[in-house]
Amino acid sequence: MIAGRRHFDCRPLHLAGNINYEPTVWSRADALKVNENDPTTTQPLVSADFPVMSDTVFIWDTMPLRELDGTVVSVNGWSVILTLTADRHPNDPQYLDANGRYDIKRDWEDRHGRARMCYWYSRTGKDWIFGGRVMAEGVSPTTREWAGTPILLNDKGDIDLYYTCVTPGAAIAKVRGRIVTSDQGVELEDFTLVKKLFEANGTYYQTEAQNSSWNFRDPSPFIDPNDGKLYMVFEGNVAGERGSHTVGAAELGPVPPGHEDVGGARFQVGCIGLAVAKDLSGEEWEILPPLVTAVGVNDQTERPHYVFQDGKYYLFTISHKFTYAEGLTGPDGVYGFVGEHLFGPYRPMNASGLVLGNPPEQPFQTYSHCVMPNGLVTSFIDSVPTEGEDYRIGGTEAPTVRILLKGDRSFVQEEYDYGYIPAMKDVTLS
């Protein structure tokens, strides 16, 4: 089933020329097809005895170093990943319970407020060695450093890190630095000048003034293989005052009888946003209308990113069970849309959009998946059930899995080691 289209009043675009398109609608009828028990779209169970890559920090969103076509790269034989990172506080009185024991669950839940961008390096594509922070304290203009994408620009080792500056506000930003390698390891240097690129505009994307719990983050830049221009996808919410959106015929889709009542679904207004750069330097950007909207379906379309394969545009995003609209449900995991052109139209993969979800018996085992062009999918471990109602907190890399993309469908294949993120190409610095 082809997802619907939602009309936007597109104002003239200075940088984008004559680009004209309507966003694809991920409809409620599409989402009703989500099947949490389909083995072809279910991630294998993660064992509760998983290893932890660090006893001193939590990690979650993982960002492999890559090029603008999506190729995951190593540099002089060293693989590099960036992660959202926060210190663990086993001895902090704030995180000790009444019996003096470390409350790791509360520490984990509080991590977002102290998120920092850190890096790791490896000769093997696993067995990651902690490198430290990318930006020194005080370089980023906000209190939180949230997810984005590190791009290797050339064989001189220059890197553009696109990321999200959060609190106060939320802005897409970038900072340029460089990678230096030796036989002993890797250093990321000179990430000292942050440039804010753009914020939500209230025309295409919801602002904080329109909705205090708005989403605007997770930049992922790429070169369109067809026109050679530099674009960026990101997470947003469809513009408009909270509660003012209409779940109309396009948003409903061809639902079966009895599913016309959407309750409070107008509050879920997620979308995958798009921007275009003036040139390949990525210094000046213009916001475009969303590529995919999820009004009445889901409020979060986090960490969108592309895989280009077989002449198709595979657009992936991640979302949660708890952000689905009333009357709908689906697992935490990867959702995807596929089309033949950057501007759509797109079709929800596997008819529903679900590509790789957590198993029902372990609904929170992994999150923040990143699909790489070689079909490998990385994620982090959130929490895995143990005995009774208890569970074990992760804050570490999950086992990597591979998915097979076949037209509009996807199939789970092999499972690999924890945090296995091999380079697809090695770049030798000049």
From Swiss-Prot:
Record-stated family: Belongs to the glycosyl hydrolase 68 family.
Keyword Repressor recorded: no
Active-site residues, as the UniProt record annotates them: D61, E302
GO MF annotation: an example: levansucrase activity
Annotated Gene3D superfamilies: Glycosyl hydrolase domain, family 43 (2.115.10.20)
Temperature dependence: Highly thermostable. At pH 5.0 and pH 7.0, sucrose hydrolase activity progressively increases with temperature until 55 degrees Celsius and then falls quickly.
Physiological role: Catalyzes the synthesis of levan, a fructose polymer, by transferring the fructosyl moiety from sucrose to a growing acceptor molecule. Also displays sucrose hydrolase activity. Can depolymerize the levan produced once substrate is completely exhausted.
Induction per the UniProt record: Expressed both in presence and absence of sucrose in the medium. The expression level does not change in a significant manner during growth.
NADP listed as a keyword: no
Residue(s) at site: Transition state stabilizer: D218
Official protein name in the record: Levansucrase Lscgamma
Pfam family, one: Glyco_hydro_68
TM segment ranges: none
Additional remarks: Strain KL103 contains two functional levansucrases, Lscbeta and Lscgamma. A third copy, lscalpha, is non-coding because of a premature stop codon. Lscbeta and Lscgamma show different sucrose splitting and polymerization properties, and differential expression, suggesting two distinct roles in the physiology of the bacterium.
Biological source species: Pseudomonas syringae pv. actinidiae
Alphabetical keyword list: Carbohydrate metabolism, Glycosyltransferase, Transferase
